[in-house]
């Protein structure tokens, strides 16, 4: 049998689960929406972040435990800069920048109720010093915080007997933070594959270790091009789902997030 799972409710609705294994306590939260869907997007963002924090509190955790976030913003390109400013202020007030900035995805999306955004997160609290969690820099891109986006390129969770890497939503961004190959989907996919591959390799993982991925495409007609580029890169059998969603810049057509697990431990934890 697996671990016991405890449901977490907010306003009578299950919005998360809490569970444990031998190494850590986990909290997965999803489907959060703002209290007032008619408020301006900035106020709705504050509401979402507060909901994240209160739900974490119900799980006896806090923002320092968060390793991964997801934000699905309606009309994302119209107010992404504003969203970033609100998130930055919230993270700064909670000391997130002094601890560990989580990996994240921020793409276009929405809820049928019409809010400006919906959100979710994954939090992990190790039970002892045998689990190491750290942000991962990209070998081919600058930190996203350099251009005002509060997320890490990836987060590594190193256990005594295996390693997990959670790669943020990644797009065709240059080392200086500018869009590369604007409006060229094939070139953007190639660049993104190279960036994600380098991230994985920096933690001694490869595409063979990827357990699942989500590819976001701005234009549904580009789905075939995405599949073609992975085949040309000889990345086959990847458990990848392609989703039609807007990307955070007008000239970006593609974004990719992946999770990877290796049965190899990266550190000597003093066991055995």
Question: What does each model-identified segment do?
Answer:
Residues 1-272:
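N-terminal presequence-like segments and the immediate start of the first folded domain
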């Amino acid at each position: 049998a697996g671990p016991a799972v405890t449901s977490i409710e907010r306003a009578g609705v299950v919005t998360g689960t809490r569970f444990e294994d031998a190494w850590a306590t986990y909290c997965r939260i999803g489907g959060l929406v703002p209290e007032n869907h008619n408020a301006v997007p900035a106020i709705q963002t504050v509401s979402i972040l507060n909901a994240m924090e209160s739900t974490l509190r119900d799980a006896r955790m806090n923002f320092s435990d968060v390793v991964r976030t997801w934000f699905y913003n309606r009309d994302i390109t119209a107010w992404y800069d504003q969203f970033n400013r609100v998130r930055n202020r919230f993270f700064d007030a909670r000391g997130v920048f002094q601890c560990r900035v989580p990996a994240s995805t921020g793409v276009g999306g929405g809820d049928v109720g019409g809010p400006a955004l919906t959100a979710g997160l994954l939090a992990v609290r190790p039970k002892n010093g045998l689990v190491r969690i750290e942000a991962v820099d990209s070998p081919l891109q600058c930190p996203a915080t350099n251009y005002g986006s509060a997320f890490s390129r990836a987060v590594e969770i190193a256990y005594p007997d295996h390693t997990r890497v959670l790669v943020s939503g990644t797009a065709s961004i240059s080392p200086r933070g500018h869009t590369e190959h604007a409006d060229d989907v094939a070139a953007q996919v190639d660049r993104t594959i190279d960036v994600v591959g380098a991230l994985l390799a920096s933690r001694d993982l490869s595409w063979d270790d990827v357990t699942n991925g989500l590819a976001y495409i701005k234009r549904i007609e580009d789905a075939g091009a995405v599949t073609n580029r992975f085949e040309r890169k000889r990345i086959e059998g990847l458990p990848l789902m392609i989703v039609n969603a807007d990307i955070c810049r007008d000239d970006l057509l593609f974004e990719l997030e992946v999770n990877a697990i290796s049965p190899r431990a990266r550190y000597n934890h003093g066991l055995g």
